[in-house]
Curated annotation (Swiss-Prot):
Organism: Caenorhabditis elegans
GO molecular function per UniProt: structural constituent of ribosome
Basic residues bias spans: 7-19
Recorded family membership: Belongs to the eukaryotic ribosomal protein eL39 family.
Segments for region (Disordered): 1-23
Entry-linked SUPFAM superfamilies: Ribosomal protein L39e
GO CC field: cytosolic large ribosomal subunit
Protein's name according to its UniProt entry: Large ribosomal subunit protein eL39
Length: 51
């Protein structure tokens, strides 16, 4: 990807970067360990974003 990005693409990338993180530990404690991991986790090489 080029260094010069359009602002809407940059915003989308920033949102996806924030979404791509593990589940906080306090959520696991709150739900009684029923939610163990973030199912929507994305690896940069395996799954590409459709931008």
């Amino acid at each position: 990807m080029s260094a010069l990005k359009k602002s809407f693409i940059k915003r989308k990338l920033a949102k996806k970067q924030k979404q791509n993180r593990p589940m906080p530990q306090w959520v696991r404690m709150k739900t009684g360990n029923t939610m163990k991991y973030n199912a929507k986790r994305r690896h940069w090489r395996r799954t590409k974003l459709k931008l």
